[in-house]
């Protein structure tokens, strides 16, 4: 499919969005339909007879467009030859009310809990999102997690209540669960007409009219009066909508109080403002599978979600540690963030980049300020639904995939080589893996292949780690859950053709400290004929939320600048294996405060060892404790098994957080240590005759009770 790309879309007409959803809320279908209709708009310019359009859609549907790309670009609105020539009622003009063409970049976000990192990473680079909900289930556990992540990044959202054709579909219940379980402020801008098999259309509350679909492909519909039986409800919801708009717009408030009729455009502008301020979530409704409600949803993306100009400038620090920010302006200095690395069979390593400011040119050199290395940008590729397009340059606010960045990984910042004030954008913080598995190749010949493949996979995915166990010499892989590691193993055989044996999943314990220690010394001196070795470092160490931090507080050159990174490296090495049970140490801050060196005998190696010695000693003194992953568990269970299931969770050291009823089942929410959850699926099945289901996802690390910690340390 050839894609006509406008040379440059003004920033106000760009939308960078993601579709966030629970695993089965219908995300793939919704995304496919969006690609279908946006692809269709290109065809519509050429095709002036409705049948051809219908044929094309049927074909496209049979072929099924799927996204394998991390960012896909589509266009919507401003169809040539339809809205522009006044044929508003002709077939084509009905697809979008929007008179100009907008560029929508869709960033793919996975729905499974083991991939929260993927969601975090996409939320970081998108400006707005569509939150998808299943009209039967309403808010599900994963929807809550993703919603909380989107709150953290302050991402404005619109909601789409999908699957209105399903048995048990209940739009109003779904909206209520958004209010109760997410603490959101949902404002329906549409209501469904009918439900389940009788779902035939939508009431547009802004324009106060009904859209009744005439065909299965969602390409033809009639705009009519609102059905009599829905009139009263529509007026009640319209009233709420206007109130929500009035709260955020004084002119609308005045008009509302004086009982004036308010123009739809004015309402949309007020709702847009409230959405961008995260005060409300406009709610749309439809059935992607039945092709209903997708075009109005796309109009909603343009009406209510932000352009790069509507979000605050991206923040970071200069190399001196001063706060800095970059405005979304192509004339400004380049600042770009690599948000995903993907192995691609055709071009090798693809690095997906969001350009926040300035212009990125193919073939140019850039500086990776996170790592302090120069990189050459090879080709720049714009991904569309099923084609790639080469770009010579990419501007602020855009997303692109780059070929040739060999040293750049997820979360790295790229700036111009000659930038006098380079910036390092805020780093992405990824959760610690919670599950370990030993892995070995089936044949000795595969050893080299296996370690290369694992290295490649670890590059792509920051929550997947590979390490060698010091005591056993085994290779250990770690990830966010059993499914995560299963998929990694599947990719090993499928993409890298490596067969491996794996051990049983183990809990990935961590160690940390509980008190500050000062003036801890590491001194490495070796005098054996010829040149000696001399390294001496004095550190303070303290507990520190949010990972490892190293602070250089050396004054007066007592340790030369060149050796300071070596001390940091030595400390990091020491933290890989804690003093209690050899697990990695997390959440500590180390200050390098003093030390000494020898003109002749000092070397990087000596200071690395000194740093490592100081850190090991500090860990012993700083009250080390063992941490274990605690999982948020949700069990959906028929009433009669409630007591039994709750008793079982408590016996697994679980803490019950609360209960809800959902339909005729009860939902129990609990925090349970991962160590107690192995084999839970089988146990739950036998306790409830297979009628209960559960989901679990990592929530936080917590201190292991003393008696259990002692047993773990003895292993």
Curated annotation (Swiss-Prot):
Q: Which CDD domains match?
A: EF-G, EFG_III, EFG_mtEFG1_IV, EFG_mtEFG_C, EFG_mtEFG_II
Q: Which domain of life is it from?
A: Bacteria
Q: Which GO terms describe its biological process?
A: ribosome disassembly
Residues holding GTP: 21-28, 108-112, 162-165
A Gene Ontology molecular-function term?
A: GTPase activity
Q: Which GO terms describe its cellular component?
A: cytoplasm
Does the keyword Magnesium belong to this entry?
no
Q: tr-type G domain: which residues?
A: 12-309
Where it sits in the cell: the answer is:
Cytoplasm
Keyword list (alphabetical) reads: Cytoplasm, Elongation factor, GTP-binding, Nucleotide-binding, Protein biosynthesis
User: What does this chain do?
Assistant: Catalyzes the GTP-dependent ribosomal translocation step during translation elongation. During this step, the ribosome changes from the pre-translocational (PRE) to the post-translocational (POST) state as the newly formed A-site-bound peptidyl-tRNA and P-site-bound deacylated tRNA move to the P and E sites, respectively. Catalyzes the coordinated movement of the two tRNA molecules, the mRNA and conformational changes in the ribosome.
Per the record, the similarity remark reads: Belongs to the TRAFAC class translation factor GTPase superfamily. Classic translation factor GTPase family. EF-G/EF-2 subfamily.
Descriptive protein name? Elongation factor G
* Name of the gene this protein is made from: fusA
């Amino acid at each position: 499919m050839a894609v006509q790309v406008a040379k440059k879309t003004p920033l106000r007409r760009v939308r960078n969005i993601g579709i966030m959803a629970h695993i089965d809320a219908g995300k793939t279908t919704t995304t496919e339909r969006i690609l279908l209709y946006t692809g269709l708009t290109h065809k519509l310019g050429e095709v002036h007879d409705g049948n051809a359009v219908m044929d094309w859609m049927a074909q496209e549907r049979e072929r099924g467009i799927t996204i394998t790309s991390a960012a896909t670009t589509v266009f919507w609105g401003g169809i040539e030859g339809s809205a522009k020539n006044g044929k508003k009622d002709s077939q084509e003009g009905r697809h979008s009310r929007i008179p100009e063409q907008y560029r929508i970049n869709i960033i793919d976000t996975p729905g499974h809990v083991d991939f929260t990192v993927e969601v975090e990473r996409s939320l970081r680079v998108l400006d707005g999102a569509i939150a998808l909900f299943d009209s039967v289930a309403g808010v599900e556990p994963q929807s809550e997690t993703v919603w909380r992540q989107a709150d953290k990044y302050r991402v404005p959202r619109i909601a789409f209540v999908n699957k209105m054709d399903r048995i048990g579909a209940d739009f109003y219940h779904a909206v209520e669960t958004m209010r109760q379980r997410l603490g959101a402020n949902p404002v329906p801008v549409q209501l469904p007409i009918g439900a389940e098999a009788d779902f035939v259309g939508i009431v547009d509350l802004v324009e106060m009219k009904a859209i009744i679909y005439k065909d299965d492909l969602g390409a033809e519909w009639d705009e009519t009066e609102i059905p009599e039986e829905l009139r009263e409800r529509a007026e009640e919801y319209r009233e709420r909508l206007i109130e929500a708009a009035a709260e955020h717009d004084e002119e609308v408030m005045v008009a509302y109080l004086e009982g004036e009729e308010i123009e739809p455009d004015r309402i949309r502008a007020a709702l847009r403002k409230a959405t961008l301020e995260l005060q409300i979530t406009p709610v749309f409704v439809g059935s992607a599978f039945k092709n209903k409600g997708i075009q109005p949803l796309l109009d909603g993306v343009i009406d209510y979600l932000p352009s790069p100009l509507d979000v605050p400038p991206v923040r970071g620090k200069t190399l001196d540690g001063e706060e800095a920010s970059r405005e979304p302006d192509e004339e400004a200095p380049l600042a770009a963030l690599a948000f995903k690395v993907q192995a691609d069979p055709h071009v090798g390593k693809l690095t997906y980049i969001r350009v926040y400011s300035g212009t990125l040119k193919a073939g140019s050199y850039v500086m990776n300020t996170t790592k302090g290395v120069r990189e050459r940008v090879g080709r720049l590729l714009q991904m569309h639904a099923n084609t790639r397009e080469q770009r010579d340059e990419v501007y602020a606010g855009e997303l692109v995939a780059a070929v040739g960045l060999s040293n750049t990984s997820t979360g790295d910042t790229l700036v111009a080589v000659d930038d006098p004030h380079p910036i390092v954008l805020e780093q992405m913080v990824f959760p610690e893996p919670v599950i370990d598995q030993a892995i070995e190749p089936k044949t000795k010949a595969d050893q080299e292949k296996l370690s290369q493949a694992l290295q490649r996979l670890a590059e792509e995915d920051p929550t997947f780690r590979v390490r060698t166990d010091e005591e056993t010499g085994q290779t250990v892989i770690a990830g966010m859950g059993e499914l995560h590691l299963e998929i990694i193993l599947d990719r090993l055989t499928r993409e890298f053709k490596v067969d491996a044996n794996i051990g049983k999943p183990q809990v990935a314990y961590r160690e940390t400290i509980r008190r500050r220690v000062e003036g801890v010394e590491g001194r490495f001196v070796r005098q054996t004929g010829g040149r000696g070795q001399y390294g001496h470092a004095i550190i303070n160490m303290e507990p520190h939320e949010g990972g490892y931090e190293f602070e250089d507080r050396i004054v007066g050159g007592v340790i030369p600048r060149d050796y300071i990174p070596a001390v940091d490296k030595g400390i990091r090495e020491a933290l890989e294996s804690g003093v209690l049970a050899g697990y990695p140490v997390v959440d500590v801050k180390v200050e390098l405060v003093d030390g000494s060196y020898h003109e002749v005998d000092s070397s990087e190696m000596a200071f690395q060892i000194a740093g490592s010695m100081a850190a090991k000693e500090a860990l012993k003194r700083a009250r080390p404790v063992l941490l274990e992953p605690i999982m948020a568990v949700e069990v959906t269970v028929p009433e009669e098994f409630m007591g039994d299931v709750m008793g079982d969770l408590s016996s697994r050291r679980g803490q019950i957080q609360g209960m809800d009823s959902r339909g005729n089942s009860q939902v129990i929410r609990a925090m349970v240590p991962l160590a107690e959850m192995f084999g839970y699926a089988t146990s739950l099945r036998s306790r409830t005759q297979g009628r209960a289901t559960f989901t679990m996802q990592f929530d936080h690390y917590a201190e292991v009770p003393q008696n259990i910690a002692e047993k773990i340390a003895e292993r």
